Structure formats: structure tokens, C-alpha cells
A protein has these predicted regions:
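Nucleic-acid modification enzymes, centered on SAM-dependent nucleic-acid methyltransferases
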Residues: 1-262, 268, 272-319, 333, ...
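Nucleic-acid endo/exonuclease domains
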Residues: 320-328
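A short glycine-rich, Lys/Arg-flanked "PGG" loop and its adjoining helix->strand segment in the class I
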Residues: 327-345, 373-377
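Short beta-strand segments at enzyme active-site cores
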Residues: 345-351
Length: 429
């Protein structure tokens, strides 16, 4: 895409000569560069403008499905007018984005204080429509089930197994499809040059600011379409075992019952991911579609956060407070599991090790040391470790970042009460 300054505005054209391609981007080193006058503008000024007056949008190119390849087209004035002329729906998510969490703070920083602001008007029209249709689909599924003679029964949330629960299940799966659709239909989506397709929001485990974003067509056959998301959900259902009944219980891990169970856990990685704040991106849409079907599960306006076992400095009064909260909670979880542990069955713990988690002098990070220390103090013995290459090296998360490189499976068994103690010097001997 080649920008050209024309009078007081900038026009964009599709170039085919690599020699004429722009040599660099316009945002780097905390500054933005004006294409017209080459002036540098501080990021803090751009953010002030974004929060006070908002950022504009301009359609600069259209990607079409061609004969076994992508076609890149310059938008007409009519097409550009359609984009800016769409009216934003009234009933959109208005829940606030946490402004102090670095995983999501780019949104309010650039004039998007609510979760609904992360989407264009056209995307909001599509998502609210799909979301509302979930309820209509449930009513149709209920009528169809009742017409076959199936008993009405209890709701799905009450462990029902009749027509009502069936309709609730259909609606739940459809809502999960809509939830997946948001990942490919927001103003945070970017363009993958290598695959020539839209890149989803969570290609990284954080929400960045995207200056040149993509709007995918939910009715197309390309990446990000709605039926593709439904297919992912259906494949997951097909892959689930139907030989045994599964039971899921959501509870605080520090007080959960670990009796007659085998524990295998993938715990939070200290401060690496702000799970609950990031989950709000999907939760606001799931709640819109399913709060009448799962009222207890979706009773809160946003994802509950206070008990989340993550070392979050802004939620626990700084780094020291976050470390103490995580260390204390982690130790209580493992002590609770140790209380009724069966020595015949080991506990397995997955830990994703960062590429730069070990420094040049061999010291490990706070997260790794905290987790190991909590396990040992809780009465466990680490009897084996198995490395697993669980992350794809070329994925977006790993390119130029301190990404999670591999997983280590720790095998734990209860340490006998009369186990002897040895110091480091004795161990080295």
C-alpha cells in the first residue's frame, strides 16, 4: 500500500513494484511520524488526542477472494462512504476496560474506554445481530425437540436432560461460536503478510494497539467467517468422549476438595498473563447471549478478579504485595492437595518456561523460584521432570519477544513426614 500526499489529505494506492514500497512504518520509538510533513509527534500527544477527540478511521484497501489467490483493490468513494456511514448500535457492551492492567491498557490509552469501543460500527452491527439470534435459535431448537415428544425437563444449569436442556446446550454452543467470532472481528485484528489473511486479536496474550487493522467478512469463506467458528466448536464436541460422563465444578482452588482424585494442573505463571482482565473481552459477549441460560455462572457484570491467583501488582499494592499474594495462595493450593493425596498416584504440574527466565549467571526468575518453593514447603517431593516442546517457535507470540519456549512437566509425590533433611553442601557431595 503506497501513501501519497494530495493537498491536505493522503490517498492510498495498491503498488506492485517493491522498489516503490514504503521503507518504514510511521510509529516507532514512542513517536509517530506525519506522512505529509515528516514531523515527529510524541505518543503522549497522540494519546491525548485519542482520549479527548477520538481517532478516525480510513479504508485504505480491500482484499478480495480471487482465482486461487488474493486480489488487492483500491476502495471506491462509495465503499469508503459506506464504512463511515454505518450507525453504531445502541445496545453494545459498555463495561469499562481496566486502565491499570498492562495487558489491556492500550484500549483506554487510545480512546477506547469500554469493551464495545474495541469494535467498529459495522462489526458491532454484525456481532449484536449474531448474539441476539442465539436466543431465537434456542426457541426454535426447543420447539423442534418438544415436537419429537421429548419431555420438557429442567434447564441445563440445573443438570436437566430434556428438551429445555437440549435447547440451552444448542444456544451455548452457538454463543461460543459468536465469542470466537469476536477474536477475528475487532479493530485490534491485524494482517498476516505471510498467510495473506486476518490475524486474530489474541495472537499475543495481550491486547495491543493496532494502527492498520483488518475487518474480516463474517459471511465469506475466508479466515474469520462465522461458519468457520461454528465448525471449530462442532469439531471440539465431536472430539469429546461420550463413553463416560464428565462433571465440572468451578471453585476456589485453595479450598477445593482433593479427595479420591488424581491432580494434573496447569497453574498460572506468576505475572505472565492477566487471565481475568483479558477474559472480559469474550465475557461481555457471552453474557449478552447466555445470561438467561446460565444465570449463576454469568451473574457478575465482568469476570470475577479478586481471588484470581496471579501476581498482579496493580491489584495487590505493588510488586511485593503481588508476590506475597501469589506465594501464599499457591502454597495453600498445594498444601490443600497434599492433605488427602494418595501416595500411589503422582501429581503432575505443567509449567511453561520462558526463553529468558534464566539469567546469564544462572539465576532463575521470581515466578519459577516461587512455584518450586511453594511445592516443597507444602510437603511435596519433586520426583521427575519431563521437558515438552509445547509452543510453536514461529507463532506471533514468539517473534521478537520473551515468549514461553517450552513446558516442563513436574511429577510430585507426597513427602513422608519423617523424610530426612539435607543441605546444599551435603547434596553436592
Amino acid at each position: 500500500i503506497v501513501p501519497t500526499v494530495v493537498g491536505d489529505h493522503i490517498e492510498y494506492s495498491i503498488g506492485h513494484d517493491p522498489q516503490g514500497a514504503p521503507s518504514a512504518g510511521t510509529i516507532a520509538g514512542g513517536k509517530g511520524r506525519c506522512l505529509a510533513c515528516e514531523s515527529l509527534v510524541e505518543n503522549k500527544y497522540i494519546r491525548r488526542q485519542a482520549t479527548s477527540k477520538g481517532l478516525g478511521q480510513q479504508l485504505i484497501a480491500i482484499v478480495a477472494e480471487g482465482d486461487r489467490r488474493r486480489e488487492y483493490l483500491e476502495p471506491t468513494q462509495v465503499q469508503s462512504d459506506v464504512v463511515v456511514g454505518i450507525e453504531r448500535p445502541a445496545d453494545v457492551p459498555t463495561q469499562a476496560v481496566p486502565a491499570r492492567n498492562h495487558d489491556v491498557d492500550r484500549l483506554p490509552m487510545y480512546g477506547m474506554p469500554t469493551w464495545g469501543d474495541a469494535f467498529t460500527a459495522r462489526q458491532l452491527v454484525a456481532l449484536t445481530t449474531f448474539s441476539d439470534l442465539v436466543g431465537e435459535a434456542r426457541e426454535r431448537a426447543l420447539r423442534d425437540a418438544l415436537s419429537t415428544g421429548m419431555a420438557e425437563g429442567e434447564r441445563l444449569e440445573e443438570a436437566g436432560a430434556g428438551a429445555t436442556a437440549y435447547a440451552d446446550a444448542v444456544a451455548t454452543y452457538l454463543a461460543l461460536g459468536v465469542s470466537r467470532l469476536t477474536d477475528y472481528n475487532s479493530s485490534i485484528c491485524s494482517w498476516s503478510s505471510s498467510r495473506e489473511t486476518v490475524r486474530n486479536v489474541f495472537s499475543r496474550q495481550a491486547i495491543p494497539m493496532t494502527w492498520d487493522f483488518l475487518e474480516s467478512n463474517p459471511f465469506s469463506k475466508s479466515t474469520g467467517n462465522f461458519l468457520g467458528q461454528i465448525d471449530w466448536v462442532s469439531q471440539s464436541v465431536k472430539g469429546s468422549s461420550t463413553s463416560f460422563a464428565g462433571f465440572v465444578e468451578q471453585s476456589d482452588a485453595t479450598v477445593a476438595k482433593y479427595v479420591d482424585v488424581v491432580v494434573s494442573t496447569d497453574p498460572p505463571y506468576y505475572d505472565n498473563i492477566g487471565y481475568s482482565d483479558l477474559s472480559d473481552f469474550f465475557y461481555v459477549w457471552l453474557r449478552r447471549s447466555l445470561k438467561g441460560i446460565h444465570p449463576r455462572l454469568l451473574s457478575t457484570v465482568l469476570v470475577p478478579k479478586e481471588e484470581e491467583l496471579v501476581a498482579n501488582p496493580y491489584r495487590h499494592g505493588g510488586r511485593d504485595g503481588a508476590r506475597c499474594f501469589f506465594e501464599d495462595g499457591f502454597e495453600r493450593v498445594f498444601a490443600r492437595a497434599r492433605r488427602n493425596a494418595n501416595p500411589d498416584y503422582p501429581m503432575t504440574v505443567y509449567y511453561a518456561f520462558k526463553q529468558a527466565e534464566t539469567t546469564a549467571d544462572g539465576r532463575t526468575s521470581t515466578g519459577w523460584a516461587t512455584i518450586l518453593g511453594a511445592m516443597i514447603r507444602s510437603g511435596w517431593t519433586i520426583t521427575a521432570t519431563w521437558p515438552m516442546r509445547s509452543e510453536r517457535g514461529g507463532r506471533m507470540t514468539s517473534v521478537g519477544t520473551n515468549a514461553l519456549a517450552s513446558s516442563i512437566v513436574l511429577v510430585l509425590r507426597p513427602r513422608p513426614e519423617d523424610a530426612p533433611i539435607i543441605d546444599r553442601r551435603g547434596l553436592m557431595r
